[in-house]
A protein has these predicted regions:
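Short, aromatic- and cysteine-enriched interfacial helices/patches
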Residues: 2, 18-22, 340, 371
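Bacterial Sec-dependent N-terminal signal peptides
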Residues: 2-9
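Hydrophobic transmembrane signal anchors and adjacent membrane-proximal interface regions, especially
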Residues: 3, 20, 46, 81-82, ...
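Helical cap/lid subdomain of alpha/beta-hydrolase-fold lipid enzymes
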Residues: 177, 181-435
């Protein structure tokens, strides 16, 4: 009896995968924090106190993934949080342990470029400037929201640690590249058209990041995004969110206001929905859906490079088991929301990509395939991806505590994982702060 999937079954799996991904917000987990949305900009957390009060000299900033939300901006309030779920409160817990740690707020569905720019302004403060050339190229507004600034003194010599979960790791890599090398497109556009240009696009800003740590990041893309498709999933998810959550009374910020997905004060709901239908968002590749594909990520990998002054480290899990003919199947203890995508990834043509955490293949989460890597040891190394051992039985959400049904990974194990990572940051500073 052949176990080869029929085209009809493959299509059915893809349709089910689309439904599951939409329902479960999957290219990373959904945040549902309780902080009032009105506090997001004013109480953007995170005033940096005197370093002598903390274990870490350089502030630690956590960057959420696709369809992730910072405190108070998510679609469902009162039922957990992105960083720790119901198991930990990573921001509060680690501040109590003596660490200077913050959570960034960037677009839930935006492209890595847009999210990287937002992350820059989240840290530095000011009104988001996506760049005149970028805005003209893709057809969205040049300016976005205004951030209060979590670390206004951030500049060369004043470093930070960046930790990204899922797509957050890609976003961090893009920001680092912009800091060092800027945007030649923006520089050229300004030369031709005049006007102002953000310091971010001029480049030359090194010695600002101490370490980059990625957790379950699809450095080489995810077949889940490939199979779902860019346009269909955007229409299904973003339009529904925009229609239901982008109205004037909603606290939800999906991070697509630059595309017009926010109702204006003088606009009726009917007028808003009609305007949304005309947005160029529906046909663009300037969004997170495309950037998570293997094609979109390949572009990112060839745009970015390793900084010899930064400590890089990756963490990746797996929660699949061998199936027929070399396939991989979701483990019985995997979060049920990931099982369809896990099984779909587990059948892709290239066997090296089949083992996965429900959303990201192990081979994708370890390091960008075109960049230098080595096995992580106790020695602090810079300018190379230090790959930690694969964490077996850990699915995509286990790292951030959002799998409420998890029985094999205890709260203590999760806390140990984060304890070790934060202690690692402090050890890194003994090397990186000498620069």
């Amino acid at each position: 009896l052949s176990t080869k999937e029929s085209p009809e079954n493959e299509k059915d799996d893809s349709r089910k995968g689309i439904k599951a991904l939409t329902k479960n917000s999957q290219a990373t987990t959904r945040n549902t924090a309780t902080t009032e949305a009105s506090k997001e900009l004013k109480d953007q957390t995170n005033k940096v106190a005197s370093q002598k009060e903390y274990k870490n000299h350089d502030p630690i900033i956590l960057v959420h993934g696709f369809n992730g939300y910072a405190s108070g901006t998510g679609p469902i309030t009162g039922k957990g949080n992105y960083w720790g779920g119901d198991r930990l409160k990573i921001i509060q817990d680690y501040r109590a342990k003596g660490y200077n740690v913050m959570e960034a707020s960037v677009s839930a569905f935006g492209s890595n470029y847009d999210r990287a720019v937002e992350l820059y302004y989240y840290i530095k403060g000011g009104r988001v400037d996506y760049g005149a050339a970028h805005a003209a190229k893709y057809g969205h507004e040049r300016y976005g929201k205004t951030y209060a600034g979590a670390y206004k003194d951030w500049k060369p010599g004043q470093k930070i640690h960046l930790i990204g979960h899922s797509m957050g790791g890609q976003t961090i890599r893009y920001l680092e590249e912009l800091l060092r090398h800027g945007s030649p497109e923006e520089v050229e556009y300004q030369k031709q058209h005049g006007g102002d240009i953000s310091p971010l696009y001029k480049g030359g800003q090194d010695n600002m990041i101490s370490s980059i740590t990625t957790i379950a990041t699809p450095h080489n893309g995810t077949h889940a995004a490939d199979l779902l498709g860019n346009e269909e999933i955007i229409r299904q998810v973003a339009y529904d969110y925009a229609r239901s959550k982008g109205n004037k009374l909603s606290h939800v910020d999906v991070g697509l206001s630059q595309w017009g997905l926010k109702q204006r004060e003088d606009e009726t709901l009917a007028q808003y929905i009609q305007r949304v239908k005309q947005s160029k968002l529906w046909t663009t590749k300037d969004n997170g859906f495309y950037d998570l594909t293997t094609e979109g990520t390949d572009i990112l990998n060839h745009k970015t490079s390793l900084n010899p002054n930064i400590v890089y480290k990756t963490y990746q899990g797996e929660s699949t088991r061998p199936g027929p003919n070399g396939t991989q199947k979701a483990d019985v203890n995997m979060n049920i929301g990931y099982t369809l995508t896990a099984n779909t990834i587990g059948k892709v043509k290239d066997k090296a990509w089949r083992e996965n955490d429900g959303l990201v293949s192990v081979i994708s989460g370890q390091y960008p395939l075109n960049q230098a890597h080595t096995s992580a040891t106790d020695q602090v190394q810079k300018g190379v991806w230090q790959v930690t051992p694969v964490k077996h039985n850990w699915d995509h959400g286990d790292f951030v505590g959002t799998d409420t049904s998890e029985v094999r990974i205890s709260k203590e194990e999760l806390e140990d994982f984060w304890d070790n990572m934060f202690e690692d940051m402090v050890r890194n500073e003994k090397v990186t702060d000498k620069q």
